[in-house]
Amino acid sequence: MKMEEMSLSGLDNSKLEAIAQEIYADLVEDSCLGFCFEVHRAVKCGYFFLDDTDPDSMKDFEIVDQPGLDIFGQVFNQWKSKECVCPNCSRSIAASRFAPHLEKCLGMGRNSSRIANRRIANSNNMNKSESDQEDNDDINDNDWSYGSEKKAKKRKSDKNPNSPRRSKSLKHKNGELSNSDPFKYSNSTGISYETLGPEELRSLLTTQCGVISEHTKKMCTRSLRCPQHTDEQRRTVRIYFLGPSAVLPEVESSLDNDGFDMTDSQALISRLQWDGSSDLSPSDSGSSKTSENQGWGLGTNSSESRKTKKKKSHLSLVGTASGLGSNKKKKPKPPAPPTPSIYDDIN
């Protein structure tokens, strides 16, 4: 006897019917659930009533095939600029300007990469300063951290002292030092006055211009005869840093036309006149010329040319001497009107 016959032989007819009914119910339930899920999906996806579609709604989605119109029936404008949405700032930008805008917005271009790196470095410095502030409460004291927040970024030439470009002769431009200074400034575009001490400021203002630029906020390192700035600006800088008792240092001049004395001019004129009196008079020159022509048989052109040259040189020397003497009598020019200064903003 088989095992199936042994298991079913001990069951009653009622139990067999119950088992058959349960199996039938499971099959019907599975088939109904599958059908319901298919109908639900077709309705949600929109393809359940494809065969019984309304003709009016079909006209709304009908493909248009006419010249000058696109498939939706709209007028096609080929000159209309296409717009793209920036993924970073969500702005609508023309397609022709999308690539450069994306470089600047994401910090991937030449200039924008430097700006982005600078922003990242500043944010890292701020985070580091905040963490240090939690450790030490006195880290932001003005006496100790005055210049720490405004440290300039080191140049590549400063990072590499063995660079061949550093051995080249430096041109004396505005903000550059041509000679070795007791205080060595690494910034070639000017000196930041905020990082200098009182002694450094005093020594700098006695030998250099020191006027603060309106754009870079740095001091000019040219000499005291800087043509870009006036004496009034230099005097204002010294009063601002050294107090009202500060005086603009005098500049030694290698050639001073105003120092010519009238006595020297008179002596020069008299000497030139004495030298001129040693020449022959016109009458004597005429007699000498005739005697020379008769005695030696020479022409008079050479003697006349020499005398005209002497007279011209004599007149030119007298004119220069009188011009030098008249420099003393010239009136000084009125001072230039005061220019608007930037120290009101600093104060």
From Swiss-Prot:
One of its GO terms (cellular component) is SAGA complex. It is found in: Nucleus. Residues 116-125, 275-288 have a biased composition (Low complexity). A zinc finger (SGF11-type) spans 84-105. The modification Phosphoserine is found at residues 129, 131, 278, 281, 326. Residues 132-141 have a biased composition (Acidic residues). PROSITE patterns: SCA7 (PS51505). One of its GO terms (molecular function) is zinc ion binding. Belongs to the SGF11 family. This is Ataxin-7-like protein 3. It comes from Mus musculus (Mouse). The lineage of its organism: Eukaryota, Metazoa, Chordata, Craniata, Vertebrata.
